[in-house]
UniProtKB/Swiss-Prot annotation:
Its cofactor is FAD. Homodimer. It comes from Bacillus subtilis (strain 168). GO terms for molecular function: ferredoxin-NADP+ reductase activity; flavin adenine dinucleotide binding; NADP binding; thioredoxin-disulfide reductase (NADPH) activity. Belongs to the ferredoxin--NADP reductase type 2 family. The gene is ycgT. One of its GO terms (biological process) is cellular response to iron ion. The keyword Flavoprotein applies. Its EC number is 1.18.1.2. This is Ferredoxin--NADP reductase 1. FAD binds at residues 37, 45, 50, 90, 125, 287, 328. InterPro entries: FAD/NAD-bd_sf (IPR036188), FAD/NAD-binding_dom (IPR023753), Fd--NADP_Rdtase_type_2 (IPR022890), Ferredoxin-NADP_redctase_2 (IPR050097).
């Protein structure tokens, strides 16, 4: 190994919710930790696309805005002062003769570590934009691929195109404050949580199925109406709007990690029940992980992160305890 290089016990790739909580738990296990995040700020997909979305599937928290959750996770992670690197994508992976792992960043910077925890979600995310020549001219006006501020839609006629969790959740969040909310989905069935779909259908939200968004009609100021088409009959309708939200999913790219020799299944990194990958010293947690009966919730990732940390600790020190002491007894936390 090159001399005078700082070597970390754990380097976490990804600074989203799971990466942040994993960094906290690394501190509980007294592991020297670095977090590398591709984006210019921490929080991952939650900060980027869902800062105002209310998250309700974390035990003990009836509901919390995405941005508030991230702020609390950042504060928690900072307890043990992990080093944070932003605006850097990890492109290279190399193992030296002494077992040290060298990660290369997008600008050529080398990061030396004894273990790696992949908490990078599904990799880099890019929204699936509406396939229309007009979409680009309306982006930044009244065409949106996410909701940054709920109040911006107050008293507006809103159309949401999509049928997954995000589309359903935004419909429910906006229904009390918008003048009207219309959801356009190309299938009869929705992909959201059953209770959320039921809530939407029992509210004032207008649901159009099976319809697809076909055309944007407007001028230099923005979209004035949209044309939707019935996927079976071909019947078309024009809907006057003030704001259009498109939730057509994401393009997912694990990027250079696909070349590291990791076992990949269904676009995710295959893990065992200890969150170990097929590469020694490399672990995974959160949406990046694949295993049987995987639970795709933040709450599930909050369990996987500590499991990965405990496995990393055992990898570094086979005589170590299986898990950290309870946080209520930790010397850095007992007076907080």
């Amino acid at each position: 190994m090159a001399e005078n290089q700082e070597v970390y016990d754990v380097t976490i790739i990804g600074g989203g919710p799971i990466g942040l909580f994993t960094a906290f738990y690394c501190g509980m296990r007294e592991l020297k930790t670095k977090v590398i995040e591709f984006l210019p700020k921490l929080g991952g997909k939650v900060s980027l696309f869902f800062p105002e979305k209310i998250i309700r599937d974390i035990g003990g928290i009836p509901g919390i805005a995405g941005k508030q959750l991230i702020e609390q996770l950042k504060e928690q992670a900072a307890t043990f002062d992990p080093d944070i690197v932003l605006n850097q994508r990890v492109t290279g992976f190399e193992r030296l003769d002494d077992g040290t792992i060298v990660l290369t960043g997008s600008e050529g910077k080398k990061h030396y570590t004894r273990t790696v925890i992949l908490a990078c979600g599904m990799g880099t995310l890019e929204v699936n934009e509406f396939d229309s020549e007009d979409a680009a001219r309306y982006a930044g006006k009244n065409l949106h691929y996410g909701v940054e501020k709920l109040d911006a839609f107050k008293g507006k006629r809103v159309v949401i195109s999509g049928g997954g969790d995000t589309a359903v959740d935004w419909a429910n969040e906006l229904e009390p404050i918008a003048a009207s909310v219309t959801v356009v989905h190309r299938r009869e069935e929705f992909g959201g949580m059953e209770s959320s779909v039921t809530k939407m259908k029992q509210s004032s939200v207008r649901v159009l199925t099976p319809y697809r968004l076909e055309q944007l009609n407007g001028d230099e100021e923005g979209i004035k109406s949209v044309t939707v088409c019935h996927t079976e009959s071909g019947q078309r309708k024009d809907i006057e709007i003030d704001e259009l939200i498109i939730n057509h999913g994401f393009k997912i790219d694990l990027g250079p990690m696909m070349e590291w020799g990791l076992e990949i299944e269904e676009g995710r990194v295959k893990a065992d029940r200890h969150m170990r990958t097929n590469l020694p010293g490399v672990f995974v947690a959160g949406d990046a992980a694949f295993y049987e009966s995987k639970l795709r919730l933040i709450a599930g990732g909050f369990t996987e992160g500590p499991t990965a940390v405990n496995s990393a600790k055992a990898y570094l020190d086979p005589k170590a305890e299986n898990m950290a002491m309870y946080s209520t007894h930790h010397k850095k936390l007992v007076h907080k």
